[in-house]
Amino acid sequence: MAIFIRKTHPLLKIMNHALVDLPAPSNISLWWNFGSLLGLCLIIQILTGLFLAMHYTADVSMAFSSVVHICRDVNYGWLIRNIHANGASLFFICVYLHIARGLYYGSYLYKETWNIGVILLFLLMATAFVGYVLPWGQMSFWGATVITNLLSAFPYIGNMLVQWIWGGFSVDNATLTRFFAFHFLLPFLILALTIIHLLFLHETGSNNPLGINSDADKISFHPYFSYKDLLGFFVMIFFLTTLALFMPNLLGDAENFIPANPLVTPPHIKPEWYFLFAYAILRSIPNKLGGVLALLFSIFILMLVPLLHTSKQRSNIFRPLTQIFFWLLVANSIILTWIGGQPVEQPFITVGQIASVSYFSLFLIIMPFASWCENKILSLN
């Protein structure tokens, strides 16, 4: 009876169907590991964040000092802080690779799973943004000021909206307190949505590299993919610990070692590296409202991808034309990330504008047209 308790117990039965006896396609590659890696990232971030919250003080006069206190006086506080800060970067690397895999292999045709995923991305970006403000360094303060100020672009309600978010007439104590509250709350919302994301995924089953129905060739998740995921865990933890122990400030900004000063503006205000592609799109449009809308659309365009799928095949694996444009999109996103970190001057302005137009064109026009051309070529044969 003990052997089958996982199949009969009301709680264990749910876990069993999700992690043990789940039928999975036999040919899913390493690209399918990123879902579980994201789960691990989320757990690491929640646990390290919880310990940091025990020692952090959400007050403008003490926030910076409390972070210094964590790094100097708390047992292994420096390690917890470095893992949390670099864990966010690794989280976004895994997210972007997970999305890229979904785009390449046509996983977006599971519309419910995909759309929940896009909402998860938006929440993750919001969490990372409010978290970046908490150390109350120069880039934290000015990043919060510049990004929240963008809401003033909305007609009629803009200025009121900004003051409502700030809790006053400038970024101050009320802003920091509420951002800390949001940063604590949002990961649990992400956790809840992740469960819904998995629920929708298990309704349809996983996609596979060929993009075809794999019902005839399924294997159980455990032990095959559980061990495969475990290997991914070890590799990711190795990278995270290497980053946190040897190069903890590699992906951070030197300006954040200076306490926030509303009277001194940093020479170049920029967000963390994982937002730079969207920041470059925002900056490439001279109009403020247009820039804000383009920024939002650069994320929410992912929701249109299932509607723009014109190909008769699901995966890109047998579609050389679409493959070329997919890799162009990847290269374009890397260029946008680089441009976002550069000062606003020529030739960076022009390159950013070309890359921004290319980004939207590839999604909305070029890739759907390439799929249509491939359909025509196939029908000729």
From Swiss-Prot:
Positions that bind heme b b562: 84, 183
Species of origin: Sphyrna tiburo tiburo
Note: Heme 1 (or BL or b562) is low-potential and absorbs at about 562 nm, and heme 2 (or BH or b566) is high-potential and absorbs at about 566 nm.
Subunit structure: The cytochrome bc1 complex contains 3 respiratory subunits (MT-CYB, CYC1 and UQCRFS1), 2 core proteins (UQCRC1 and UQCRC2) and probably 6 low-molecular weight proteins.
Topological type in the membrane: Multi-pass membrane protein
Chief site of localization: mitochondrion
Residues reported in the UniProt entry to bind a ubiquinone: 202
Transmembrane spans: 34-54, 78-99, 114-134, 179-199, 227-247, 289-309, 321-341, 348-368
Gene: mt-cyb
Location within or outside the cell: Mitochondrion inner membrane
GO molecular function, one term: ubiquinol-cytochrome-c reductase activity
Lineage top rank: taxon: Eukaryota
Gene Ontology annotations of biological process type: mitochondrial electron transport, ubiquinol to cytochrome c
PROSITE patterns linked: CYTB_CTER, CYTB_NTER
Cofactor(s), names only, from the UniProt record: heme b
Record note on cofactor: Binds 2 heme b groups non-covalently.
InterPro entries for this protein: Cyt_b/b6_C, Cyt_b/b6_C_sf, Cyt_b/b6_N, Cytb/b6-like_sf, Cytochrome_b, Cytochrome_b_C_euk/bac, Cytochrome_b_N_euk/bac, Di-haem_cyt_TM
Any single GO CC term annotated in Swiss-Prot or TrEMBL for this entry: mitochondrial inner membrane
Protein's recorded name: Cytochrome b
Family assignment from sequence similarity: Belongs to the cytochrome b family.
The protein's role, per its UniProt record: Component of the ubiquinol-cytochrome c reductase complex (complex III or cytochrome b-c1 complex) that is part of the mitochondrial respiratory chain. The b-c1 complex mediates electron transfer from ubiquinol to cytochrome c. Contributes to the generation of a proton gradient across the mitochondrial membrane that is then used for ATP synthesis.
Organism placement in taxonomy: Eukaryota, Metazoa, Chordata, Craniata, Vertebrata
Annotated CDD domains: cytochrome_b_C (cd00290), Cytochrome_b_N (cd00284)
Keywords in alphabetical order: Electron transport, Heme, Iron, Membrane, Metal-binding, Mitochondrion, Mitochondrion inner membrane, Respiratory chain, Transmembrane, Transmembrane helix, Transport, Ubiquinone
Residues that, per the record, bind heme b b566: 98, 197
